């Protein structure tokens, strides 16, 4: 509507102002937005999901996520950090990120959060895989979590026949861009005389799949899980200790093909499984009477090839 007063025209027509006209970042080219996000920490990036649709579409894009993880992975090689989970059994579960040497105040953080709705339930945690962790609580629930953003998702309960306990392992298939959880179920009646646990049922859960359920898979290798064993993921394969034909062995599960294989371990007996760069290594435990740490590195699983070196550790008595 317009009114004419003398030679002036007064208009009171409302003009809709969009966010892109008020926010200078909305008109920024896509590659510049991605460049800015690449320099931010994951916890800060997660807040952009609520900022606007354009920023959310970038953050939730799989190509951007994969590129971000690759960049942060190579950065972490020069700035390794520790992730600790502490349960005080009275307040809540807390995660601690260790400090970086360059900026001790920037990377250190304490995050208090619950992987489930019951904070006083204890959890076993698997080693991180691309920033995510797999948790198992004492009510046999498997939980996938992001400790950086404190987001957790409980997977469907593992349906078993007569088996009581479950042992989950976590991995990633880079070809199909899929996270998978390998779960083995056992029962007390399947404990062997030596105390090892017989693996009977093997199931796989694929994160992000439309059918949110566990799938039964076949394992032709009869093996016994070593008590307290913890799986290690590296280059598309989950590794864990087990006994095969009464011999301590290294089991391999290829996440993509969902196939099992076994690697003979070097002698003498090894007791620790760890990542060694982009490879897998096994070591012995250090005792007061033992001053040598033997490290074996798996060079080629298909050829059963290992390399090794020895580290002389000062006597604990002299420290």
UniProtKB/Swiss-Prot annotation:
Residues 22-71 form the F-box domain. It comes from the Eukaryota. It holds the Pfam family FBA_3. GO terms for cellular component: chloroplast. This is Putative F-box protein At3g10790. It comes from Arabidopsis thaliana.
């Amino acid at each position: 509507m317009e009114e004419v007063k003398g030679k002036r025209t007064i208009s009171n027509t409302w003009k809709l102002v969009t966010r892109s006209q008020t926010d200078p970042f909305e008109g920024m080219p896509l590659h510049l937005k991605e460049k800015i996000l690449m320099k931010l920490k994951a916890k800060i990036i997660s807040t952009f999901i609520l900022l606007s649709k354009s920023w959310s579409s970038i953050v939730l894009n799989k190509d951007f996520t994969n590129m971000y993880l690759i960049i942060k992975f190579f950065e972490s090689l020069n700035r390794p950090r520790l992730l600790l989970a502490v349960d005080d059994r009275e307040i809540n579960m807390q995660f601690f990120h260790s400090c970086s040497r360059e900026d001790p105040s920037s990377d250190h953080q304490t995050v208090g959060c619950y992987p489930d709705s019951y904070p006083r339930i204890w959890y076993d945690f698997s080693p991180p895989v691309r920033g995510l962790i797999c948790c198992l609580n004492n009510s046999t629930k498997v939980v996938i979590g992001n400790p950086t953003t404190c987001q957790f998702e409980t997977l469907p309960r593992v349906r078993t026949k007569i088996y009581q306990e479950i042992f989950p392992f976590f991995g990633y298939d880079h070809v199909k861009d899929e996270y998978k959880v390998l779960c083995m179920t056992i029962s007390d009646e399947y404990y062997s005389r030596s105390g090892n646990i017989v693996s009977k049922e093997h199931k796989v859960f694929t994160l992000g799949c439309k059918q949110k359920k566990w799938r039964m898979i076949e394992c032709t290798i009869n093996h016994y899980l070593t008590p307290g064993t913890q799986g290690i993921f590296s280059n598309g394969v989950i590794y864990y200790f087990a006994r095969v034909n009464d011999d301590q062995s290294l089991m391999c599960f290829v996440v993509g093909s969902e196939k099992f294989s076994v690697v003979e371990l070097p002698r003498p007996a090894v007791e620790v499984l760890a990542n060694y760069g982009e490879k897998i290594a096994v070591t012995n435990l250090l005792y007061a009477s033992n001053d040598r740490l033997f490290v074996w590195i798996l060079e080629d699983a298909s050829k059963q090839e290992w390399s090794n070196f020895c580290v002389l550790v000062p006597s604990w008595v002299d420290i």
